[in-house]
A protein has these predicted regions:
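N-terminal periplasmic "start-of-domain" segments of outer-membrane beta-barrel proteins
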Residues: 26-61, 81, 89
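Short acidic/polar hinge/loop motifs at secondary-structure boundaries
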Residues: 101-129
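Transmembrane beta-barrel wall of Gram-negative outer-membrane proteins
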Residues: 172-201, 212-261, 272, 276-290, ...
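Solvent-exposed loop segments that connect transmembrane elements
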Residues: 206-228, 306-327, 364-380, 418-454, ...
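C-terminal beta-signal and adjacent terminal beta-strands/loops
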Residues: 207, 484-485, 558, 657-661, ...
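Flexible loop and strand-edge segments within Gram-negative outer membrane beta-barrel domains
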Residues: 231, 235, 248-293, 301-333, ...
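Outer-membrane beta-barrel signature, preferentially recognizing the C-terminal barrel domain
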Residues: 270-289, 328-333, 381-389, 441-443, ...
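Gram-negative outer-membrane beta-barrel transporters
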Residues: 399-406, 414, 540-556, 561-664, ...
Length: 742
């Protein structure tokens, strides 16, 4: 049935192709030098699309669901990890207001997009094909650029500008609730803006029973068979911005604050019970005689704490009711960027720039009083971790003729990583000789401490793009890219082979444990991609097709590891959670993205339209023949839209094929196909907007293909949890939101 639905969606896509102020913003001073760049811009989600989704989600990454080629790894409720063409997390560069932010957590519970509420997103652009070197770097999957609203200034002669907005929302399934407020005061040269948002939710319920146990390990506390344990959250994000404008120059400062007292995880052994982030972002932007100059310095500090949440067994030590398995992480990022757009001629633009980033990480697990296995000393997971990047790039864009536009770019990145010596719970010193120790902690620490941990990678990126527009209704963009990514600190420097420790180093949500390798090489990806764009001259209808092929040398995959013998496991264990070690192998990915929209009719019921999206990705390990982990199966979405006066409504049909191609080495869980129907409506009247809808209208049960393994309740400190239980999707949920602008 699901394949028939998907086939129908695929057949419908070509039909789309065949259908015949008072305030000044930053954009007013930055125009020259950008005209050609827009031709190679990423997919712009757009303010209308962003606004339409805000009432339905508190997860900023989910705003990208309708972008061709994008899927989402399931994680916490507000921390999904975007994947582009099958590559996610650190393989995708995510920039937030120009800052490169790094997850400071062994489970990557605090990704960059978790620090911005959907209501505070001004623009999001996704570079899912060939990424220009001016926005790429240290990534192989693509780039996501998210920005808060640009500062606005009063018109010349106006005494002052005061504006803002406030909103609230509610969602029924998990009792999600929250609100946001933003306010701006500006003159023609000064701007101060505050924005704040808070949201919280309880555990959500699936559309049916998906597990065979109710126990949580917390005494008599149990969860219903349809309740997804460890899916609740609470978070608050605030931003304060100050900007000064003079002639063609802008100076801007932004302070960001996050207080997240909890975000529970249904696919991790631990839960986030505190995350505090502070960021300071300073920027200069100017339009000069020769082009534009953009310079920025920023700093971020993160304090992160994990423990067993209320749905997971807490007490593993007799007599100690105050500690389960505490884990602390502190990360500090300092960065600087400078970019210049130089107008060489009316046809040529040269972009040059440089970037610096310094990242420091400490990840330690405090001793548990009275525990033989988790004491008497702190466990040093990553001690004084360092990851420093220095990069330079140059990019030449040339308009050869009215029909042809080309782009050629080269980027150099030098990445230095290092980490200090470590010890386990059993020692207070840093061993360089010895063996054994409970759970092989001494042996593993000795091997790590004696290894050469200071690594330097010299990485080269290359992008060549061309765009051909033979008519006003057709564009073809095609190109080649070489992209390189160096391993992150957890891939290189997590060191324990023990089950209990390794399962805490996992940011893919598959329930397994992971062990690093100090000798990992950078991943090197070579991509061919093209986009065929047919459209009306006024874009009333359009149809896009993007085929792509990527081959990755030294792809960081994983092999099953025997902690006792400290070698790769053979034969492989099946149908259970295991320990794996990161290793360099070879991979290839290919696929196609289809998207389009068309008007249907103008009737007394309003303007009717149809839009659609279809994605397909295939990923394979070329060394082992295994399928790559967490590849989204064939999926499609068709939406019937209606607009009448202030009404803007839609009926969505979401279709996902079965996930049958899975990574055998990781014992990845297969998921069946499904189809969902969502209803969405909004009404705008003057300064007020009301959004409401129903997600999963028919309360259909389904498992999330990229949601990972369910580890949301019970005794999670080991490998013995029930295997083959996928995290299910949410059952029927009604939502409503109101926003008022003043």
């Amino acid at each position: 049935m699901k394949r028939k639905l998907l086939s129908a969606a695929l057949a419908a896509m070509p039909c789309i192709a065949l259908a015949a102020g008072e305030a000044n913003t930053l954009d007013a001073i930055v125009v020259v030098g950008q005209r050609s760049a827009e031709r190679f811009d990423g997919e712009d989600v757009g303010s209308k699309r962003l606004t339409a989704q805000r009432a339905a989600t508190s997860d900023t990454a989910s705003l990208l669901r309708d972008v061709p080629g994008v899927s989402l790894y399931g994680a916490g409720a507000v921390s999904s990890l975007p994947a582009i063409h099958g590559m996610a997390d650190d393989r995708v560069r995510v920039k937030l207001d120009g800052m490169d932010l790094i997850s400071s957590c062994p489970n990557h519970m605090n990704p960059a997009l978790s620090y911005i509420d959907p209501t505070n997103v001004g623009t999001i652009k996704v570079y899912a094909g060939i990424t220009p070197v001016s926005v790429g770097g240290d990534s192989i999957g693509g780039t996501i650029v998210a920005e808060t609203p640009a500062p606005e200034f009063a018109a010349p002669g106006q005494t002052g500008l005061f504006k803002g907005e406030a909103g609230v929302f509610y969602r029924s399934n998990n009792n999600a609730r929250g609100g946001n407020i933003a306010a701006t005061y500006a003159t023609d040269a000064f701007n101060i803006t505050y924005s704040g948002a808070t949201s919280a939710a309880d555990n959500y319920k699936a559309a049916g029973e998906f597990k065979t146990f109710t126990a949580t390990g917390r005494g008599t506390n149990t969860l219903p068979l349809d309740e997804v344990g460890s899916s609740a959250y609470k978070t608050t994000n605030q931003t304060l911005g100050i900007a000064f404008k003079g002639a063609n120059h802008l100076i801007e400062a932004r302070l960001g604050l996050q207080d997240m007292p909890k975000q529970l995880y249904p696919n991790q052994r631990m839960d986030l019970l505190d995350n505090e982030q502070r960021s300071l972002n300073l920027r200069y932007l100017g339009q000069l005689a020769w082009g534009t100059l953009d310079a920025r310095i920023y700093n971020e500090n993160v304090k992160h704490f994990m423990e067993f949440g209320p749905d997971k067994k807490f007490a593993y030590t007799a007599g100690n009711t105050s500690q389960g398995m505490p884990m602390k992480t502190e990360g500090k990022t300092t960065g600087a960027t400078i970019k210049a757009n130089i107008d060489l001629s009316k046809q040529d633009v040269l972009r040059v720039g440089g970037e610096l980033q310094q990242y420091r990480l400490n990840d330690w697990w405090p001793a548990v009083v009275g525990s033989a296995g988790m004491g008497p000393n702190d466990f040093l997971n990553i001690n004084n971790g360092e990851r420093d990047r220095t990069s330079l790039f140059g990019e030449w864009e040339q308009r050869l003729s009215k029909e042809w536009l080309t782009l050629l770019g080269l980027r150099f990145e030098r990445v230095n990583t290092n980490a200090g010596m470590v010890h386990g719970y059993n020692l207070a010193t840093f061993p360089t000789a010895g063996a054994g120790g409970m759970m092989n902690q001494t042996r593993d620490a000795v091997g790590f401490n004696n290894a050469n941990r200071d690594k330097t990678d010299n990485n080269w990126d290359l992008t060549a793009l061309a765009r051909y527009a033979p008519s006003t209704s057709q564009d073809i963009e095609f190109g080649f890219a070489r992209k390189v990514r160096s391993p992150n600190l957890y891939e290189r420097y997590s060191w324990s082979t023990a089950n209990m420790m390794s399962i805490m180093n996992n940011y893919v949500g598959d329930g397994n444990g992971y062990l690093g390798d100090v000798n990992l090489k950078p991943e090197k990806a070579h991509t061919l991609s093209a986009t065929f764009d047919w459209h009306a001259a006024n874009r009333d209808w359009e149809f896009k097709a993007t085929p792509y092929y990527t081959r990755v040398t030294d792809y960081i995959d994983a092999v099953q590891w025997n902690g006792t013998t400290n070698v790769a496991r053979s034969p492989l264990l099946t149908n259970q959670f295991v320990v794996l070690k990161y290793t360099n192998q070879s991979a290839r990915l290919y696929g196609i993205d289809l998207s389009g929209r068309m008007p249907l009719a103008r009737t007394g019921l309003g303007e009717l339209g149809l839009k659609g999206l279809l994605n397909y990705t295939n990923g394979k390990n070329r060394d082992t023949g295994d399928d790559l982990y967490n590849i989204m199966p064939l999926n499609a979405k068709l939406t019937l839209t209606q607009k009448l006066g202030g009404w803007d409504n839609g009926v969505e049909l979401v279709m996902v094929d079965a996930k049958s191609k899975v990574a055998d080495a990781r014992n990845e869980i297969k998921t069946p196909g499904y189809g969902l129907v969502n209803l969405r409506a909004s009404y705008t009247w003057k300064q007020t907007r009301v959004d409401f809808g129903v997600e999963n209208l028919f309360d259909k049960f389904y498992s999330l293909p990229l949601g990972g393994a369910y580890t949301g309740q019970g005794t999670t400190m080991g490998l013995a949890l029930p295997w083959n239980v996928a995290v299910p999707g949410m059952g029927r949920s009604l939502y409503a939101g109101v926003n008022y602008k003043f």
